[in-house]
Amino acid sequence: MTVALEQAPQALHLRAWESAHLRVRGGTLWLTQDGKPDDLFLASGQQLLLLGPACYRLGALDRSGAELILQKN
């Protein structure tokens, strides 16, 4: 999955029993969770386990975009 700077943030909805493993392959990814005050910034090589129930918003921080691998469980 590739996220471009020009795109609106992409939504990722996880239900209560779902999780997703996110790994950034290139660029810098901006990530926020609806209802939470803190944003996260992940660089190439970093990974994160996302837990539901939640809605996450994903976006790129620079013109090169962000390339990521997302595996839902």
Tell me what each language-model feature is.
Residues W17-L29:
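Glycine- and acidic-residue-biased ligand/ion/polar-headgroup-sensing regions
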Residues M1-A16, L42, L49:
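Conserved short histidine dyad/triad with adjacent acidic residue
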Residues G52-N73:
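Ligand-binding loop in jelly-roll beta-barrel domains
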Residues Q46-Q47, Q71:
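Structured catalytic cores of enzymes that bind and process phosphorylated ligands/cofactors
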Residues A16, Q33-D34, G52, A60:
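Conserved "cap/hinge" positions at secondary-structure junctions
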Residues T28-L31, Q47:
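Short beta-strand segments in beta-sandwich/barrel cores
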